[in-house]
Design a protein with these regions (language model features):
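Hydrophobic alpha-helical scaffolding
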Residues: 2-6, 162, 192
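Acidic, Mg2+-coordinating catalytic module of metal-dependent nucleases/exonucleases
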Residues: 13, 190-220
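A residue-level signal for conserved active-site and pocket-lining positions in enzyme catalytic cores
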Residues: 13, 54, 62, 105, ...
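Short, glycine/acidic-enriched loop or turn micro-motifs at the edges of active sites
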Residues: 57
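Short beta-strand scaffold segments in enzyme catalytic cores
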Residues: 60-66
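ATPase catalytic-site recognition across NTP-hydrolyzing enzymes
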Residues: 1-53
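Mg2+-dependent endonuclease catalytic cores in nucleic-acid-processing enzymes, primarily RNase H-like
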Residues: 63, 71-191, 213, 217, ...
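Hydrophobic/aromatic-lined pockets within catalytic cores
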Residues: 18, 69, 207, 211
Length: 253
């Protein structure tokens, strides 16, 4: 009977969409709850802003994250849209961002893959449309570890290091709450149902990246670098970036 077989029969023969989502292994982010992770007020003071994306022809998923001088991060905008070309995706992101200054645009390594027919990559197309992407790690375990650390609720503050501005990221929160552990590799989240992975993969780009807090001084004198140096900087390691800043000054990105 279904009662005797429990999770096994639920996974093989789900009666509802909700049952289909609740595969064996359990929720990967059980800590994510609206009462702890969603906040009513935006971060204030000097802020660094990032956009992290997951892109494919089936879906563009993007999230805007701001970080203050105390290493508090807040996701304050999301955007999901299927069937966009790379050029359309870049133009849409720039339009939504408007005049906000974005420190870094974060993306997974597959966007640097060149197509056999054109020899161009998504990175190339975004660059032509005015967005210079920065490559993050695609290591799933490292990314999941980073996400768990950012989303862990502090015993002291009763809040995670990464929060969500109220009513701005409903789909991301839904996906984080629904996505399950990989039943064969419980230390990472499952890649099915695929519909749940876009927003989670996007946020993983931010969480796996080395993130600098906002400068405590509001007025930081920045230097204008050559385009080739800026591209090298965006793709450099933490250590190389520090050396470049030491030699050339803070870049005007």
């Amino acid at each position: 009977t279904k009662r005797a077989l429990g999770d096994l029969i639920t996974a093989e023969y789900p009666a509802t969409i909700e049952e289909a989502l609740m595969v064996p292994g359990g929720a990967y982010f059980p800590e994510v709850k609206k009462d702890t992770h969603e906040v009513a007020e935006p971060l204030t003071g000097p802020l660094r802003r990032y956009v992290c994306i997951d892109y494919g022809l089936d879906m563009l998923s993007a999230h805007w994250v701001q970080v203050d001088t105390s290493e508090n991060a807040q996701c304050y905008r999301e955007y999901d849209m299927p069937d966009l070309t790379a050029g359309q995706a870049a133009d849409t992101l720039l339009s939504i961002t408007s005049d906000e200054y974005i420190d870094t645009w974060l993306a997974p390594p597959d966007l640097w893959n060149r197509r056999n027919d054109t020899g161009r990559s998504v990175f190339d197309i975004f660059y032509e449309h005015g967005i210079i992407l920065t490559k993050t790690s695609n290591d799933l375990f490292s990314g999941c570890t980073g996400m768990k650390e950012w989303l862990r609720v502090s015993e002291e503050t009763k809040r995670p290091a990464l929060t969500f501005l109220k009513d701005t990221c409903p789909n991301l929160i839904r996906c984080l709450q629904k996505i399950q552990k990989d039943k064969n590799k419980p230390k990472v989240y499952a890649k099915t149902p695929h519909e749940l992975t876009h927003d989670v993969d996007s946020l993983r780009c931010f969480c796996v990246w080395w993130v600098r807090s906002a400068d405590k001084k509001k007025n930081v004198k920045k230097k204008k670098w050559r385009a080739d140096l800026i591209e090298d900087y965006r793709n450099a390691s933490k250590e190389i970036r520090a050396l470049m800043i030491k030699e050339l000054g803070e870049p005007m990105l």
